[in-house]
Swiss-Prot record:
Residues that bear Sulfotyrosine: 36
Domain Peptidase S8: from-to ranges: 153-459
Species in which this protein is naturally found: Callithrix jacchus
Modification sites for Phosphoserine: 45, 686
Family according to the record: Belongs to the peptidase S8 family.
Gene: PCSK9
Record-level Gene Ontology MF annotations: apolipoprotein binding; low-density lipoprotein particle binding; serine-type endopeptidase activity; very-low-density lipoprotein particle binding
Renumbered residue ranges of the record's region C-terminal domain: 448-690
Record bears the keyword Transport: no
Protein name: Proprotein convertase subtilisin/kexin type 9
GO terms, biological process: apoptotic process; cholesterol metabolic process; low-density lipoprotein particle receptor catabolic process; proteolysis; regulation of neuron apoptotic process
Record domain Inhibitor I9: where: 75-147
Subunit note: Monomer. Can self-associate to form dimers and higher multimers which may have increased LDLR degrading activity. The precursor protein but not the mature protein may form multimers. Interacts with APOB, VLDLR, LRP8/APOER2 and BACE1. The full-length immature form (pro-PCSK9) interacts with SCNN1A, SCNN1B and SCNN1G. The pro-PCSK9 form (via C-terminal domain) interacts with LDLR. Interacts (via the C-terminal domain) with ANXA2 (via repeat Annexin 1); the interaction inhibits the degradation of LDLR.
């Protein structure tokens, strides 16, 4: 925690105006928010008009990497507000240089961003941060930091569907319609694995190597990039053997780069896309650094422009949400497994995990091109290799269906993955329920499954422990939020609900007094032409409980949720499992508001499946039949010991407190409600295309 002294100004206003070019005091406050540190600088003055005169009404923020040793003080990315004019970055940079010069400081302008985000990169003294943060149009400033390569033939067999396996890897197509951009070290483009398949661009933005005695050898400088290029599209050991690669050098010979160089590389891709639009683009980011707001924002901008980004989860045996670009929601984040489908261990470290990981892929002892010679091969391990596998699979899927959106591609990658094959005991206990048990695999047919209703589960960050703390989970813009649930390890929660925020529906979960925090869990689905709404029944106060219905004609129940204001609902009468004709309603505790999520979409049909067991039960599950997709997962009110409900693939899981600490009555029941849906419209459309 650091502070900067603040001085009150008592001189007359005319004299103050003469002194405006002199240093002005501020007060700074640093807060460590786990993911990053934020420094908020605001101008303080006795003269109310002084702030307006300087146009310093808005407060900008300063961010830096949470890991001390990764910080690069003296280099800063200045990000302007989104609505600023295209010419504003240069004007703001010139203004900053001029004001710094009057104070005896020199500022070196390293790069101006236009096409990715409005801003610029500067090299300057930390003493000028106060000045920069007070400039008009500045949204935030981030100190530069380091990023690192994430690398420390069973792999091709593993991603091939079982019924297609043979002695030779035979993918459905080569990914020839897709360009893959690789942001990495330099590449030995003459290696026979990738010769003629890789275009080495003239882009290069890398820091100097550490150590004065470091000897640059071509084989060392090209090592990481050459291996990954071979994994993506190598002739013998590649996943997508027909995909073309473009190499951008953002890592030095030691496999080290910076956030700023990665940003400049991403902007290079965006500029190329604008100048010469081509087919589908995949960007492979086999690197990781500390959490970076600006790097995540850049990934978001590029994804919204139609680019698919695939990133390494990181090799730190840690929560991937603490690293970038792995933590960016728009990025497909990949962890690493070995030949036995177990998480990769790398000495004392290993693959990252957690809710920010989308899936895992082969990442141990991966055979690929070696930069030692043009015919050499080498074995490498890490989440970089895992991400390269998924980039290759994505290239093949996009070659088969170039019109796939990022949301559609991600849903297909999840749907066709091998499920429940990873030993979850490897992960920390608090991360097991959050980490997807999925290993990437090619679909049996890249043209098939057009009839399938695709859904995925999105977990929020953990809320704080305060009584009014909330957690929020949201779907991608192209996805529909069909249901919302919540989970608390302590069981102290106040339920969940769907709410509209900024024109989008989000899933909110509420912590309770004495609770340790909650998670919100959104069920996000691809449902074209859907019209969805939520119908709420207020607390009944008496009787069996509350019931919420789908009132609009043609609307079908896709999910149930409930929330309450009291701290403890107490024990409820045993739930009554509904007969077949009453599956258009949600049932809740009489003291809770109950919400029915209802949707109208062409050909949509849904059914409710319920299963109850006498308490205590650690968990009760219900699974949808093949051909049906789980859209809603909730618990019927039958016991006060419910921890929450969440979806794992097409299985609804309701958890209750540990039986050893539970004192339940013989009347209490743990009951799970699964809503399973399918789309006849999608099935018909798929048949027409075939």
């Amino acid at each position: 925690m650091g502070t900067v002294s603040s001085r009150r100004l008592w001189w007359p206003l005319p004299l103050l105006l003469l002194l405006l070019l002199g240093p002005t005091g501020t007060r700074a406050q640093e807060e460590d928010d786990d993911d990053y540190e934020e420094l908020v600088l605001a101008l303080r003055s006795e003269e109310d008009g002084l702030v307006d005169a300087l146009q310093h009404g808005a407060t900008a923020t300063f961010h830096r990497c949470a890991k001390d040793s990764w910080r690069l003080p003296g280099t800063y990315v200045v990000v302007l507000k989104e609505e600023t004019h295209r010419s504003q970055p240069e004007r703001t940079a010139r203004r900053l240089q001029a004001q710094a010069a009057r104070r005896g400081y020199l500022i070196k302008l390293l790069h101006v961003f236009h096409d990715l985000l409005p801003g610029f990169l500067v090299k300057m003294s930390r003493d000028l941060l106060e000045l920069a943060l007070r400039l008009p149009h500045v949204d935030y400033i981030e100190e530069d930091s380091s990023v690192f390569a994430q690398s420390i033939p069973w792999n091709l067999e593993r991603i091939t569907p079982a019924r297609y396996r043979a002695d030779e890897y035979q993918p459905p197509n080569g990914g020839s319609l897709v360009e893959v951009y690789l942001l990495d070290t330099s590449i030995q483009s003459g290696h026979r694995e990738i010769e003629g398949r890789v275009m080495v661009t003239d882009f290069g933005s890398v820091p100097e190597e550490d150590g004065t005695r470091f000897h640059r050898q071509a084989s060392k400088c090209d090592s990481h990039g050459t291996h990954l290029a071979g994994v993506v599209s190598g002739r013998d050991a590649g996943v997508a053997k027909g995909a073309s690669l473009r190499s951008l050098r953002v890592l030095n010979c030691q496999g080290k780069g910076t956030v700023s160089s990665t940003l400049i590389g991403l902007e290079f891709i965006r500029k190329s896309q604008l100048v010469q639009p081509v087919g589908p683009l995949v960007v492979l980011l086999p690197l990781a650094g500390g959490y970076s707001r600006v790097l995540n924002a850049a990934c978001q901008r590029l994804a919204r422009a139609g680019v698919v980004l695939v990133a390494a989860a990181g090799n730190f045996r840690d929560d991937a949400c603490l690293y970038s670009p792995a933590s960016a929601p728009e990025v497909i984040t990949v962890g690493a497994t070995n030949a036995q489908d177990q998480p990769v261990t790398l000495g004392t470290l290993g693959t990252n995990f957690g809710r920010c990981v989308d899936l895992f892929a082969p990442g141990e002892d991966i055979i690929g091109a070696s930069s030692d010679c043009s015919t050499c091969f080498v074995s490498r391990s890490g989440t970089s290799q895992a991400a390269a596998h998924v980039a290759g699979i994505a290239a093949m899927m996009l070659s088969a269906k170039p019109e796939l959106t990022l949301a559609e591609l991600r849903q297909r990658l999840i749907h066709f993955s091998a499920k429940d094959v990873i030993n979850e005991a490897w992960f920390p206990e608090d991360q097991r329920v959050l980490t997807p048990n999925l290993v990437a695999a090619l679909p049996p047919s890249t043209h098939g499954a057009g009839w399938q209703l695709f859904c995925r589960t999105v977990w929020s960050a953990h809320s704080g422990p305060t009584r009014m703390a909330t957690a929020m989970a949201r779907c991608a813009p192209d996805e529909e939020l069909l249901s919302c649930s919540s989970f608390s390890r302590s069981g102290r929660r106040r339920g969940e609900r769907i709410e509209a925020q900024g024109g989008r529906r989000v899933c909110l979960a509420h912590n309770a007094f004495g609770g340790e925090g909650v998670y919100a869990i959104a069920r996000c689905c691809l449902l074209p032409q859907a019209n969805c709404s939520v119908h709420t029944a207020p607390p009944a106060g008496a009787g069996m409980g509350t019931r919420a219905h789908c009132h609009q004609q043609g609307h079908i129940l896709t999910g149930c949720s409930s929330h309450w204001e009291v701290e403890d609902l107490g024990t409820h009468k045993p739930p009554v499992l509904r007969p077949g004709g009453q599956h258009d309603q949600c049932m809740g505790h009489r003291g809770a508001s109950t919400h029915a999520s209802c949707c109208h979409a062409p050909g949509l049909e849904c059914k409710v499946k319920e299963h109850g067991l006498p308490a205590p039960q650690e968990q009760v599950t219900v699974t949808c039949e093949e051909g049906w997709t789980l859209t809603g997962c909730s618990a019927l009110p039958g016991t006060s010991h419910i921890l929450g409900a969440y979806a794992v693939d097409d299985t609804c899981v309701v958890r209750s407190r540990d039986v050893s600490t539970t004192s339940s009555t013989s009347e209490e029941t743990v009951a799970t409600v699964a809503i399973c849906c399918r789309s006849q419209h999608l099935a018909q459309a798929s048949q027409e295309l075939q």
